[in-house]
Amino acid sequence: MTIPDGLALALFVLCWLAYGPLLALLARRSGSLNDDMLVVRRAWMMAMTHREVRIVDSQLMGHTINSAGFFASTNLLLIAAVAGILFGGDQALQGFASVGAEPVPTRLLEAKLALVLLCLARGLLDFIWSIRQMNYALALIGAAPELHAEADRESLGEAAASLLNPALSAFSQGVRGYYFALAAAAWLFGSLWLAIGVVAVFCLLVWRQAASPAARAVRASRRLLEPHLPKR
């Protein structure tokens, strides 16, 4: 591995590890999309406890689970494709290298593909855990009785939100794996492309969390919803 490759890989690892702490810092200072959605989903679960018929909640959860399942299935196909090249022997690697990848030693090409595979595998594990938690939340919604005491409603709503929020956070982490896998794939065309790709992905993710129209809309919704939620 050359020095530019090593530096670009170090930058990739730095961006991967720094994204979470930076997101937490943004949440404390000015808010982030993921942090604001925690409040929105908590408000949803609180509203769910006041509904006698919870068909709409079940339908929304079912749609969310289907979305996570689609991403997980696509992720699995991508893993199979990359693993097929990586473990397919020298002929598969040489055939892949001949279609436009930067000419490099076989071991370095394997390292580049392994990085893509690692990002996808991490994303798949996040999607699987997300789907499991969403199923737990769906079961809780289905089992929720008609409650008349406000304290009981608050307790049930908090419990449901405590299941749903980590589930959707894991889903977000899985989607993030796609972005970093795309940046890792840029390494196939050279170390400079890896550096550009990971910086571009990092900046795009931060912008979407902090300054995108969706982030601003959700932040405005949080300001409306939060005063009506029970104090913790």
Report the location of each language-model feature.
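Transmembrane alpha-helical segments and their cytosolic interface motifs
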Residues: 57-84, 113, 166-195
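Cytosolic/matrix-facing juxtamembrane and C-terminal tails of multi-pass cellular membrane proteins
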Residues: 142-161, 165-166, 208-232
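Membrane-interface amphipathic/juxtamembrane segments adjacent to transmembrane helices
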Residues: 24-64
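Juxtamembrane "helix exit" motif at the C-terminal ends of alpha-helical transmembrane segments
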Residues: 76-102, 187-195, 201-206
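Hydrophobic alpha-helical membrane-embedded segments
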Residues: 5-33, 71-81, 113-135, 178-179
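Juxtamembrane inter-helical linkers in multi-pass membrane proteins
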Residues: 32-49, 135-161
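Hydrophobic alpha-helical transmembrane segments
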Residues: 1-10, 100-116, 191-196
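Alpha-helical transmembrane segments and their membrane-interface exit regions
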Residues: 18, 200-212
